[in-house]
């Protein structure tokens, strides 16, 4: 299929114009990367025959509210599936994926547990918990994911030695099919969902970061 990407980024932050700039009528450039800009790119690719549009956020810069806005905008104006791809580097990843799911996105990209979060994509295991609570059937064989994770853990250990020369901390093992979450952590998933549904961006991010911290994933902007 033709999966076409609308690459997300943000406008530079300019300093407030000084006295003389204002006096001479000079102002900062107008925003370029607006909702209308991204929708226009998506429409162009849909008209060219795209089978799916991916909101591609390689730097993890898109916060929950913005991705929810774009997902709803795309779903309203183009009639092909919408995918969302992001990373967790600045700390938005998991919260933004949750917001995208609640906004009606068709596909979200994830990583398996031992290669997730940090500079990677959100963990499929955490997304699975959210989807189960929301009544969303992902169609993913989580038993197969668990078997893959066993192999990925060994690969990660090898990479730690060959690439980093040290044993980097790994997240607590977690299989959503067999492990029971502590009540306070399970409640954080519910809190994040409620916050995302209420468009409370700060609370959504806070709850998701606490979930990630519990499992030992890197803090924002840490490897």
Roles of regions detected by a PLM:
Residues 1-223:
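Catalytic cores and adjacent flexible loops of soluble metabolic enzymes
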